């Protein structure tokens, strides 16, 4: 796989998704990543540390430059726990759990983020305002209600299907209510 091309395509996708989701500084963005799918394999069966490093590095830098927190979802072997900065866990009062991600228990994205973050910790539950799913990893459980699908500029990254979500407040009150 051409890692330079992967880097460029990841940048195009994250820039587009951030524009569409309108996520703001201080908010949380969740990433679900299957490097196996990006590599043309079956999720969880062909993990690549190099692919994870390229993708997470691009997304982490882009979000950090905008003051947006990154949460990286683990694979099912860690119950889809999330790697975040300890500062965010403290700020949101999210319970920290003990585990260090590995390539086949957490995944390549978490391993890369663990190396990039200043003070990485794992938590079981978060509420993100938006997210990017590379490889059909099912990030919906981590995105605030009401979730709205976002169609990224590119539908694939390598061999992986790419989708995204944003959220909006619930509309309540019925026909008498006004929303804007």
Swiss-Prot record:
Pfam families on file: DUF436
HAMAP family: UPF0340
Protein family (similarity comment): Belongs to the UPF0340 family.
Protein name, as recorded: UPF0340 protein llmg_0465
Organism: Lactococcus lactis subsp. cremoris (strain MG1363)
């Amino acid at each position: 796989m051409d890692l330079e091309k992967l880097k460029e395509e990841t940048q195009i996708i994250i820039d587009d998704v951030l524009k569409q989701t309108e996520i703001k500084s201080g908010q949380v963005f969740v990433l679900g990543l299957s490097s196996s799918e990006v590599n043309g394999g079956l999720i969880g069966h062909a993990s690549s540390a190099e692919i994870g490093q390229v993708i997470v590095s691009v997304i982490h830098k882009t979000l950090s430059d905008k003051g947006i927190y990154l949460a990286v979802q683990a694979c099912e072997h860690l119950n889809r726990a999330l790697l975040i900065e300890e500062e965010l866990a403290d700020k949101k009062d999210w319970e920290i759990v003990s585990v260090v991600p590995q390539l086949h228990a957490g995944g390549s994205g978490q391993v890369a983020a663990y190396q990039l973050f200043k003070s990485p910790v794992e938590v079981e539950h978060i509420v993100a305002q938006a997210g990017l799913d590379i490889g059909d990893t099912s990030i919906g459980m981590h995105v605030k209600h009401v979730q709205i699908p976002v169609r990224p500029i590119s539908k694939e990254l390598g061999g992986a299907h790419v989708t995204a979500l944003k959220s909006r407040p619930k509309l309540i009150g019925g026909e008498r209510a006004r929303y804007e």
